UniProtKB/Swiss-Prot annotation:
It is found in: Cytoplasm. SMART domains: PKS_PP. Belongs to the acyl carrier protein (ACP) family. GO terms for cellular component: cytosol; membrane. Pathway: Lipid metabolism; fatty acid biosynthesis. This is Acyl carrier protein. The gene is acpP. 4'-phosphopantetheine is transferred from CoA to a specific serine of apo-ACP by AcpS. This modification is essential for activity because fatty acids are bound in thioester linkage to the sulfhydryl of the prosthetic group. Residues 1-76 form the Carrier domain. One of its GO terms (biological process) is lipid A biosynthetic process. It comes from Haemophilus ducreyi (strain 35000HP / ATCC 700724). The modification O-(pantetheine 4'-phosphoryl)serine is found at residue 36. The lineage of its organism: Bacteria, Pseudomonadati, Pseudomonadota, Gammaproteobacteria, Pasteurellales. The keyword Cytoplasm applies.
Length: 77
């Protein structure tokens, strides 16, 4: 599975949304119905899946599907 596929799977699992709704431009809060707790849990799941640490100031910038994919890809580069 690619990084993009793994990130999307985590989003589907964490937020309970349909895979077809997880588009690159989708906002976790506005488009996928997440709240602040959901976004914290999502960041923790990304950290665990990819064995990375995402500082709070960086986590605040991860607001869309694409921003999560980009961050993880950069962290794994």
């Amino acid at each position: 599975m690619s990084i993009e596929e793994r990130v999307k799977k985590i989003i589907v699992d964490q937020l309970g949304v349909k895979a077809e709704d997880v588009k690159p431009e989708a906002s976790f809060i506005e488009d996928l119905g997440a709240d602040s707790l959901d976004t914290v849990e999502l960041v923790m799941a990304l950290e665990e899946e990819f064995d990375i640490e995402i500082p709070d100031e960086e986590a605040e910038k991860i607001t869309t599907v694409q921003s999560a994919i980009d961050y993880v890809a950069k962290a794994n580069a």
